[in-house]
C-alpha cells in the first residue's frame, strides 16, 4: 500500500500548473531573446548577457527597479491584464534612460495567491511587448505562488532593468545650467503614478464619479477604463537617437511625485526649472481629476505628469531642433521652459501661466 501524506498541492502550490505556465510563456519570452548579447534560454538559475567591449570600452552599468502600483486594480476590476506588463517595463527602462543608458535586459517578479494561467500569460505577454519596445531582452523572472498572501484574482508585479552607457556619455545632471532649455516629451496619459488619487476621484467603486465603461464627454469618446489602462509610453528608442545627435545635458522621467519631485533630480544645486503652463498639451483626464476632486493645481503638479512624460535639458540653441527631431521620431514634443538660477529657499520647479 502506497503511503499517502499531505502534498505541496494540498497546501495550495501546484507544480503542474507552474510547468504549464512555463510552457505557455515560452513563446512570449523568446521574442525578446533575439537581442544581441543574450546567451542561453529562460529556465537556467541565472540569466546571461554578454557585453560588447567594442561598443563600450568604458562601460557603466545602470540599474533600476519598480512596480506598477495601484494601476493594477484597473486590471483586476476589468479582467484586462495584457498592458500592465508594458507599464512594468516602462517604469524601469525610462528611469535608467535618464542616465543615458541603453537597456540591455529585464527581469520580472510576479506574486500571486493561486496561478491563473490565462491571466499570467497575458501579463507576461505585456512584459515581452514592453521589452521589445525598449529593445531589451527578458532573460529571467520569478512567478511565486503564495497561498493566503493575495486575494483571489489579484497579484503584484516588480521589475528590474539593467542598461549600459559608456562612461564619457553618462548623464549626471552636472552639465545642466541656467539658460538651458527644457524640452518635454508627451506622456500617454496617467502612466503608472498617482493612481490612488485618480481612482478616488474617477472610479465609483473607489468612491469616485464613474463606472469603468462610462464615457465622460471630456475624454473624447473613450471609456474611463481605456484612459486609465493606457500603458506608460516607453521613450527608449527616441531618446537614444536624440542622445546620439544632440548635446543633452539632463533627463527627468516624470513618475511618482509629478513635476515637482522629478525634474529637480536632474538639476544641480542652485538651479530651478521654470515651466510655461500652456506650452504643452495636457491630456483631458488631468483636468477631469482637477475639476471633480476638486484637486488644487499645486497638488496636481506634485502628483501627476500632467502630460509631460519626460523632460530633457538641452542648450537653448538646440531646443527647437531637439523637439523637431523628437516629433520626426513619433513623439509629441515641445519646448516647455528653461533652467534658471534658483531663488534662495525658493522652489526648484516653478510653473507659470
Swiss-Prot record:
GO terms for cellular component: cytosol. Gene3D superfamilies: PurM-like C-terminal domain, PurM-like, N-terminal domain. It comes from the Bacteria. It catalyses: 2-formamido-N(1)-(5-O-phospho-beta-D-ribosyl)acetamidine + ATP = 5-amino-1-(5-phospho-beta-D-ribosyl)imidazole + ADP + phosphate + H(+). Pathway: Purine metabolism; IMP biosynthesis via de novo pathway; 5-amino-1-(5-phospho-D-ribosyl)imidazole from N(2)-formyl-N(1)-(5-phospho-D-ribosyl)glycinamide: step 2/2. Keywords: ATP-binding, Cytoplasm, Ligase, Nucleotide-binding, Purine biosynthesis. Transmembrane segments: none annotated. InterPro entries: PurM-like_C_dom (IPR010918), PurM-like_C_sf (IPR036676), PurM-like_N (IPR016188), PurM-like_N_sf (IPR036921), PurM_cligase (IPR004733). It is an enzyme of class 6 (ligase). GO terms for molecular function: ATP binding; phosphoribosylamine-glycine ligase activity; phosphoribosylformylglycinamidine cyclo-ligase activity. It holds the Pfam family AIRS_C. Its main location: cytoplasm. Its EC number is 6.3.3.1. It is found in: Cytoplasm. GO terms for biological process: 'de novo' IMP biosynthetic process; adenine biosynthetic process. HAMAP family: AIRS (MF_00741). Belongs to the AIR synthase family. This is Phosphoribosylformylglycinamidine cyclo-ligase. The gene is purM.
Amino acid at each position: 500500500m502506497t503511503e499517502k501524506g499531505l502534498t505541496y498541492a494540498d497546501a495550495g502550490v501546484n507544480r503542474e500548473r507552474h510547468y504549464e505556465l512555463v510552457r505557455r510563456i515560452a513563446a512570449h519570452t523568446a521574442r525578446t531573446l533575439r537581442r544581441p548579447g543574450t546567451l542561453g534560454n529562460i529556465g537556467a538559475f541565472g540569466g546571461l548577457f554578454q557585453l560588447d567591449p567594442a561598443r563600450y570600452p568604458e562601460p557603466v552599468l545602470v540599474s533600476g527597479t519598480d512596480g506598477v502600483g495601484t494601476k493594477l486594480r484597473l486590471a483586476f476590476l476589468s479582467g484586462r491584464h495584457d498592458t500592465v506588463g508594458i507599464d512594468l517595463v516602462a517604469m524601469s527602462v525610462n528611469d535608467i534612460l535618464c542616465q543615458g543608458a541603453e537597456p540591455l535586459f529585464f527581469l520580472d517578479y510576479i506574486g500571486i495567491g493561486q496561478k491563473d494561467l490565462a491571466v499570467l500569460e497575458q501579463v507576461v505577454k505585456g512584459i515581452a511587448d514592453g521589452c521589445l519596445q525598449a529593445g531589451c531582452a527578458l532573460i529571467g523572472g520569478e512567478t511565486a505562488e503564495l497561498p493566503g498572501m493575495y486575494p483571489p484574482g489579484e497579484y503584484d508585479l516588480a521589475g528590474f532593468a539593467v542598461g549600459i552607457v559608456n562612461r564619457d556619455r553618462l548623464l549626471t545632471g552636472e552639465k545642466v545650467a541656467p539658460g538651458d532649455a527644457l524640452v518635454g516629451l508627451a506622456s500617454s496619459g496617467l502612466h503608472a503614478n498617482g493612481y490612488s488619487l485618480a481612482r478616488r476621484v474617477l472610479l465609483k467603486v473607489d468612491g469616485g464619479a464613474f463606472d469603468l465603461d462610462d464615457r465622460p464627454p471630456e475624454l473624447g469618446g473613450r471609456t474611463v477604463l481605456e484612459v486609465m489602462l493606457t500603458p506608460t509610453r516607453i521613450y527608449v528608442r527616441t531618446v537614444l537617437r536624440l542622445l546620439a545627435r544632440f548635446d543633452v545635458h539632463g533627463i527627468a522621467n516624470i513618475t511618482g511625485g509629478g513635476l515637482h519631485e522629478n525634474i529637480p533630480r536632474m538639476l544641480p544645486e542652485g538651479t530651478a526649472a521654470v515651466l510655461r503652463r500652456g506650452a504643452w498639451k495636457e491630456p483631458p483626464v488631468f483636468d477631469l481629476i482637477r475639476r471633480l476632486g476638486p484637486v488644487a493645481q499645486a497638488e496636481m503638479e506634485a502628483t501627476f505628469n500632467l502630460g509631460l512624460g519626460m523632460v530633457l535639458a538641452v542648450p537653448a540653441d538646440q531646443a527647437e531642433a531637439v523637439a523637431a527631431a523628437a516629433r520626426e521620431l513619433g513623439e509629441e514634443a515641445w519646448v516647455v521652459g528653461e533652467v534658471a538660477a534658483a531663488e534662495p529657499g525658493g522652489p526648484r520647479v516653478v510653473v507659470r501661466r
